[in-house]
Each structure stands twice: as structure tokens, then as C-alpha cells.
């Protein structure tokens, strides 16, 4: 039996090269080896204010991007979170098994609520919903960035607590972080992560950026004054970030890239890297726009929601029986 992978991405903001390298690029590779569930987590998105029309547009756009990067709907299950009711139902059960102190200690809650007067309860209870997303599918592996590890640890705690207290039904998920490229940094401030929500658009390369924009952003990426192309995260964070991008896209080791550019300057390196990124993203963009115009996209999402619901409802029923909700049903 194949191990199960679950991954969810919010439909808020444009996806970046960091999202692609950290997660999306691996999705096509996973589906031959694992049973994969890829979820567009629109219920997570509404923990902060959203424009309803824009949210729906971004949800459909993200689905098209998932397919454009290589997801095969015959091998993977692609669906929208809100179209599978079990997610919200399971989240409530888990919310009743988590402590407020655990939620308040979450770094993401602290960061997003800092200095704000009106913070939604949904932002605080985000982790139980994320745990439900993962646990409903008896997930073995969760591909996440370093910044999400704390949430996975809480998910494991909740699974263990529920298994001991109510019913032993959950698989214990493990974090899966690619060795290289899991954390792509900002182009202008390489001490912080590249983010799709960054106000400075120069900090990120977006997957739908035109080639000219990609070249301009990489050309203006922060480096240093030494002119030597070598990986040193502490002393040369900008160049190290660009080397990481180069390595993940080409599959070459960083050492071999360093050797290739001995005696060459940042200009040559950035020019070559820009062309590599453009070559990587152009075919994705072509497939994206084709899916966006096609009725096939909705057919795929309908089928994905149906399959996801069948799997999730089995786990939800066990959860309900475990805590004594409703009548004990055979079907």
C-alpha cells in the first residue's frame, strides 16, 4: 500500500518561485510513489478578511497552477477544502481537544495578530483545522517549509491525544522537507523568506511573471561586493540564495555551480540564472492559461472533491463514534 501525502496551499496572493521550489516542483514526482491529496485551503484563507470574488478567482487560478506544474488528476486528488464538509466538522472535534495555551503559543498566530485590535477567532483556531486537513486522509507525509513545522508538531500531539483519549484511528504524520530549496529567500532581503504576501514586489519572483520581469528581478537581486560566486549563507546570503535556486532548477550540486563560475562575475551568473528560471516557468504559464480557459478544470475539481469526501468521511465517522456524537451508524 502506498504511503499518503497531503499538502495544502492557501489561495491568497500569487504563488512565488519559493512556493514552486519548496513544494510544487516535487508534486509531480510524488504522485508515482505516493497516494497524493492536494488541497486548496480556502477555509484557511478566510481567517483574515477576503474579497469574495477575488477569493473565488484565486482558488480557481491556484487549481490551474497545480495542474500546470505537473499534477496528473488520474494519479493525484486535487480538490477545494470548502467543497469537502468533513474538514470543518473534523476541525471542530479537534478544536475541542486542543488547549488555548497551545494555540496562543503558535508563532504564526503571534506574528499575524501582533499589534492588531480585531483578530478573528479563526486565526487562533487555524491549527486544529490544519490538523483536520492532514488527519482525515490518514496522512503519512506532509511536505512543508520550515515555518510550518510547529503546526505539524501540534497535529501530531492532537492525533496522539485523540488516539489515547477516544479511539486509536489516526496515522501519525511526519514532516517531509526537501534537503535543498525548501526555503527560498527574498531577492532584496535574503535574511527573510520569499513571500507571496510581501508588499515589495521586487522581493519575489511570481510564477506568472513575464520573462522580462523575471530577468529584471534577478538582475537587481541583492548580492555583495566580493564578486565571488560561492555558497556562504552567513556572509553571502544573497548569492547563496541564488545558488540554491540554480541548484534546484538544474539538479546540479552547488559545488559544481561554484566551479563553473570561477573567474566569472555576478553579471554572468545572474544572466544565466534568469534564463534558467524563464525556461522553467514559461511552459508552466502556457499550461496554466490553457487550463484556466478549459471546462476540464471544473471537471477535475468536481471529481477530486468527490474522491476526497469518500476518504475523509470514513475518518470523520470514526471520530464521531470515538467522541460519542450522533447515533452509531454502520454506514
Curated annotation (Swiss-Prot):
Motif 'HIGH' region mapped to chain: 11-19
Protein location: Cytoplasm
Reactions catalysed: tRNA(Trp) + L-tryptophan + ATP = L-tryptophyl-tRNA(Trp) + AMP + diphosphate + H(+)
Pfam families: tRNA-synt_1b
GO biological process per UniProt: tryptophanyl-tRNA aminoacylation
Motif 'KMSKS' region: chain residues: 193-197
Alphabetical list of Gene3D superfamilies matching this protein: HUPs, Tyrosyl-Transfer RNA Synthetase
Broadest EC class assigned to this enzyme: ligase
Keywords, in A-Z order: Aminoacyl-tRNA synthetase, ATP-binding, Cytoplasm, Ligase, Nucleotide-binding, Protein biosynthesis
Protein residues bound to L-tryptophan: 133
Keyword Signal attributed: no
PROSITE patterns membership: AA_TRNA_LIGASE_I
Coarse class of the protein's main subcellular location: cytoplasm
GO cellular component: a single term: cytosol
UniProt EC number: 6.1.1.2
UniProt: ATP binding residues: 10-12, 18-19, 145-147, 184, 193-197
GO molecular function: ATP binding; tryptophan-tRNA ligase activity
Family stated for the protein in its record: Belongs to the class-I aminoacyl-tRNA synthetase family.
Subunit structure: Homodimer.
Purpose of the protein: Catalyzes the attachment of tryptophan to tRNA(Trp).
Name this polypeptide is given: Tryptophan--tRNA ligase
Organism: Listeria monocytogenes serovar 1/2a (strain ATCC BAA-679 / EGD-e)
Taxonomic lineage from the root: Bacteria, Bacillati, Bacillota, Bacilli, Bacillales
The encoding gene: trpS
Amino acid at each position: 500500500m502506498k504511503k499518503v501525502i497531503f499538502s495544502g496551499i492557501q489561495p491568497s496572493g500569487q504563488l512565488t518561485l519559493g512556493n514552486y521550489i519548496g513544494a510544487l516542483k516535487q508534486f509531480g514526482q510524488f504522485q508515482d510513489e505516493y497516494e497524493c491529496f492536494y488541497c486548496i485551503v480556502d477555509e484557511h484563507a478566510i481567517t483574515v478578511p477576503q474579497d469574495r470574488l477575488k477569493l473565488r478567482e484565486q482558488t480557481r487560478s491556484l487549481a490551474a497552477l497545480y495542474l500546470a506544474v505537473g499534477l496528473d488528476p488520474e494519479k493525484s486528488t486535487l480538490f477545494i477544502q470548502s467543497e469537502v464538509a468533513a474538514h470543518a466538522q473534523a476541525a471542530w472535534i479537534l478544536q475541542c481537544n486542543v488547549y488555548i495555551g497551545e494555540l496562543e503559543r503558535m508563532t504564526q498566530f503571534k506574528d499575524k495578530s501582533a499589534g492588531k485590535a480585531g483578530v478573528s477567532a479563526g486565526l487562533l483556531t487555524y491549527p486544529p483545522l490544519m490538523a483536520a486537513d492532514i488527519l482525515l486522509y490518514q496522512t503519512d507525509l506532509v511536505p512543508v517549509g520550515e515555518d510550518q513545522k510547529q503546526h505539524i508538531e501540534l497535529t501530531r500531539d492532537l492525533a496522539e491525544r485523540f488516539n489515547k483519549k477516544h479511539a486509536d484511528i489516526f496515522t501519525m504524520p511526519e514532516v517531509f522537507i526537501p534537503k535543498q530549496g525548501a526555503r527560498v529567500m527574498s531577492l532584496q532581503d535574503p535574511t527573510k523568506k520569499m513571500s507571496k504576501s510581501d508588499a515589495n514586489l521586487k522581493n519575489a519572483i511570481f510564477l506568472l511573471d513575464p520573462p522580462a520581469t523575471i530577468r529584471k528581478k534577478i538582475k537587481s537581486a541583492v548580492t555583495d561586493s566580493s564578486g565571488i560566486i560561492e555558497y556562504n549563507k552567513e556572509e553571502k546570503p544573497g548569492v547563496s540564495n541564488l545558488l540554491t535556486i540554480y541548484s534546484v532548477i538544474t539538479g546540479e550540486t552547488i559545488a559544481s555551480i561554484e566551479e563553473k563560475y570561477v573567474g566569472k562575475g555576478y553579471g554572468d551568473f545572474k544572466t544565466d540564472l534568469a534564463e534558467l528560471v524563464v525556461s522553467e516557468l514559461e511552459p508552466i504559464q502556457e499550461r496554466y492559461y490553457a487550463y484556466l480557459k478549459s471546462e476540464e478544470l471544473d471537471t477535475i475539481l468536481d471529481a477530486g472533491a468527490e474522491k476526497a469526501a469518500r476518504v475523509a468521511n470514513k475518518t470523520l465517522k470514526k471520530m464521531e463514534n470515538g467522541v460519542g456524537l450522533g447515533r452509531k451508524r454502520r454506514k
